[in-house]
Swiss-Prot record:
The gene is Slc22a5. Its main location: membrane. This is Organic cation/carnitine transporter 2. The modification Phosphothreonine is found at residue 550. It is found in: Apical cell membrane; Basal cell membrane; Cell membrane. Gene3D superfamilies: MFS general substrate transporter like domains.
Length: 557
C-alpha cells in the first residue's frame, strides 16, 4: 500500500509547479499582514485638546489659556479632557482681566469638553478616533475595536478547519479572502463606531480562515521537505511583507476611509489567483474524486516537464487514510495523565504570553518615540530575520533552549527600557525592536514545538487548545497597550515580566529535538528529557480498572 507522497514522488521536490504553488499561496497571505495591523493607523489617536468655539467672545490671551496644564514626562502640556469653564473666563475676558496676572488660573472651575475636541493633523488627517471622538471617557472604545477583531479571529479559527474539510481548501481560501476584502470595503461606509466594529469582527473571521486554508493547502500539495519551509518561512515572511507595506500605504493616504479603500485593492487582485491555484489533490481523494485529483497531478507533471505514469492513483493500491478505523479521543485526554496535563497547562501559558507580547508590541507603534510610519515599518521588517533565525534554530538546536533564549532576550530588553533616559529615545525604540525580534522568533518556533510534544491521537486538539490561548492573548493585548496612557513604561514592564517568567517555565518542558513524534499518550511520556517512574499505589476504585498514569517527575537541563 502506498501513501500519497509515494504516489506523487515522481513530480520531484522543487520543480516549477512547486515553486508556483509556494509563492502564490504565500502571496495570498500579504493582505492578511496589513489588514491585521491596519488598526494601528485606522484608530490612531492624535494629539488633542478641548475645542473652544470661535463663537465664544474671548481675548487672545484668554483663548491661549483656556486649557489647564498638566505635568507629563517632566513637561507642562495642555490637558486633553478638561478646559476652564467658558462662561467664567468669557466674563473675565469681557471685564479686561488678564489670566495669570489678575486671575489665579489654579482656582478656576473646570469642565469637560462639552463642544468636542480639536485634533492635531500633522500625523493623521482623520481616523475613527477623530471621526467619532473616541477619546477621554470613550477612549476605551479604540482598544475594544482591536480586541473584537481578534474575537473574530478566534471565531474564524474554530470554523475554518471544518469549512475547508467539507467544502475544499481552495473554495474556502477564496471565499474567506473575499470575505476579508469585502467587509473591509464595507467598513469604508461605516456611519458609526458600532457598524465599523461589527464589520471588523467579520474581517477578523475572514482573515484567519484565509490564512488557515492557504496553510493547509500548501502543506498538502507541497512535498515533505518543502512544506516545512513553507510553514515556517513562506507564509510568515509574506505576512511580514504585508505588514511592511502597511506604513507605506498609510504614509501617503492619511484619511482612514481612503486608506481602507486602498488596502482592499491587493485583496481584489488576489482573486486572479483562482485560475492558478488548484484544489488539494489529497482532499479530492478523501472525497472520492480521484479523477479530478489525477487531472491536477498530470497538469503539475506537465509544468515540471515530467512524463506522468499512465495510472497515477490506483484505488486498489492507494492507501486511503479515511479507511482506517478512527479512534475516539476527546479534549479530556489533554488532562488525563499528570504529564500531559502539565504540558497542556504550560503550553497554554506559553502561547498566551507570546501572543500578548507579539501583538502588544505591534499595536504599541503609536506610543514609540519617532516617526510612526518608520517605526511600524521597522517593527514589521524585524520579523523577517526573526523567522529566518527561528528556522535555523529549529534545524540545529534543542527546542526548549531556543524558545527560552528568544523569550529571555525579548523580555529582558523590555524590562531594561524603564532605565533608559527619556532623551535617549532612539535607544528605547531599538530595544522595542530587539524585543519584537525575540518574541517573534519564539512565536514561529512554538508552532512546531507544540506539534512535536503532543501524540498523534490528540495532536490537533493539543495545538488547537494552545492556539485558542494565543487568540485570547491577542484579545488582551490592546489593553496592555492601553495601560500606557497611565504610565509610559507599564506595558513594557508587564510584557517583559511575563515573557521572562515564561522563558523560565519553558525550560521545564520535555525536549523533542531529534525524537520521533509520539503516536500515543503513553509514548508521550518517553520523550527525551523526562524522567519517569510508575506511581505505586493502591488499586484504584474505578470501573475501567486503569493503571496509575506515569507522571512528569523532573526535567533534565
Amino acid at each position: 500500500m502506498r501513501d500519497y507522497d509515494e504516489v506523487t514522488a515522481f513530480l520531484g521536490e522543487w520543480g516549477p509547479f512547486q515553486r508556483l504553488i509556494f509563492f502564490l499561496l504565500s502571496a495570498s497571505i500579504i493582505p492578511n499582514g496589513f489588514n491585521g495591523m491596519s488598526i494601528v493607523f485606522l484608530a490612531g489617536t492624535p494629539e488633542h485638546r478641548c475645542l473652544v468655539p470661535h463663537t465664544v467672545n474671548l481675548s487672545s490671551a484668554w483663548r491661549n489659556h483656556s486649557i489647564p496644564l498638566e505635568t507629563k514626562d517632566g513637561r507642562q502640556v495642555p490637558q486633553k479632557c478638561r478646559r476652564y469653564r467658558l462662561a467664567t473666563i468669557a466674563n473675565f475676558s469681557e471685564l479686561g482681566l488678564e489670566p495669570g496676572r489678575d486671575v489665579d488660573l489654579e482656582q478656576l472651575e473646570q469642565e469637560s469638553c462639552l463642544d468636542g475636541w480639536e485634533y492635531d493633523k500633522d500625523v493623521f488627517l482623520s481616523t475613527i478616533v477623530t471621526e467619532w471622538d473616541l477619546v477621554c471617557k470613550d477612549d476605551w472604545k479604540a482598544p475594544l475595536t482591536t480586541s473584537l477583531f481578534f474575537v473574530g479571529v478566534l471565531m474564524g479559527s474554530f470554523i475554518s478547519g471544518q469549512l475547508s474539510d467539507r467544502f475544499g481548501r481552495k473554495n474556502v481560501l477564496f471565499l474567506t479572502m473575499g470575505m476579508q476584502t469585502g467587509f473591509s470595503f464595507l467598513q469604508v461606509f461605516s456611519v458609526n463606531f458600532e457598524m465599523f466594529t461589527v464589520l471588523f469582527v467579520l474581517v477578523g473571521m475572514g482573515q484567519i480562515s484565509n490564512y488557515v486554508a492557504a496553510f493547509v493547502l500548501g502543506t498538502e500539495i507541497l512535498s515533505k521537505s518543502i512544506r516545512i519551509i513553507f510553514a515556517t518561512l513562506g507564509v510568515c515572511i509574506f505576512y511580514a511583507f504585508g505588514f511592511m507595506v502597511l506604513p507605506l500605504f498609510a504614509y501617503f493616504i492619511r484619511d482612514w476611509r481612503m486608506l481602507l479603500l486602498a488596502l482592499t485593492v491587493p485583496g481584489v487582485l488576489c482573486g486572479a489567483l483562482w485560475w492558478f491555484i488548484p484544489e488539494s489533490p489529497r482532499w479530492l481523494i478523501s472525497q472520492g474524486r480521484i479523477k479530478e485529483a489525477e487531472v491536477i497531478i498530470r497538469k503539475a507533471a506537465k509544468i515540471n516537464g515530467i512524463v506522468a505514469p499512465s495510472t497515477i492513483f490506483d484505488p486498489s493500491e492507494l492507501q486511503d487514510l479515511n479507511s482506517t478505523k478512527p479512534q475516539l479521543h476527546h479534549i479530556y485526554d489533554l488532562i488525563r495523565t499528570r504529564n500531559i496535563r502539565v504540558i497542556t497547562i504550560m503550553s497554554i501559558i506559553l502561547w498566551l504570553t507570546i501572543s500578548v507580547g507579539y501583538f502588544g508590541l505591534s499595536l504599541d507603534t503609536p506610543n514609540l518615540h519617532g516617526d510612526i510610519y518608520v517605526n511600524c515599518f521597522l517593527l514589521a521588517a524585524v520579523e523577517v530575520p526573526a523567522y529566518v533565525l527561528a528556522w535555523l534554530l529549529l534545524q540545529y538546536l534543542p527546542r526548549r533552549y531556543s524558545i527560552s533564549a528568544a523569550l529571555f532576550l525579548g523580555g529582558s530588553v523590555l524590562l531594561f527600557m524603564q532605565l533608559v533616559p527619556s532623551e535617549l529615545f532612539y535607544l528605547s525604540t531599538a530595544l522595542v525592536m530587539v524585543g519584537k525580534f525575540g518574541i517573534t522568533s519564539a512565536y514561529s518556533m512554538v508552532y512546531v514545538y507544540t506539534a512535536e510534544l503532543y501524540p498523534t491521537v490528540v495532536r490537533n486538539m493539543g495545538v488547537g487548545v494552545s492556539s485558542t490561548a494565543s487568540r485570547l492573548g491577542s484579545i488582551l493585548s490592546p489593553y496592555f497597550v492601553y495601560l500606557g496612557a497611565y504610565d509610559r513604561f507599564l506595558p513594557y514592564i508587564l510584557m517583559g515580566s511575563l515573557t521572562i517568567l515564561t522563558a523560565i517555565l519553558t525550560l521545564f518542558f520535555p525536549e523533542s529535538f531529534g525524537v520521533p513524534l509520539p503516536d500515543t499518550i503513553d509514548q508521550m511520556l518517553r520523550v527525551k528529557g523526562i524522567k519517569q517512574w510508575q506511581i505505586q499505589s493502591q488499586t484504584r476504585m474505578q470501573k475501567d480498572g486503569e493503571e496509575s498514569p506515569t507522571v512528569l517527575k523532573s526535567t533534565a537541563f
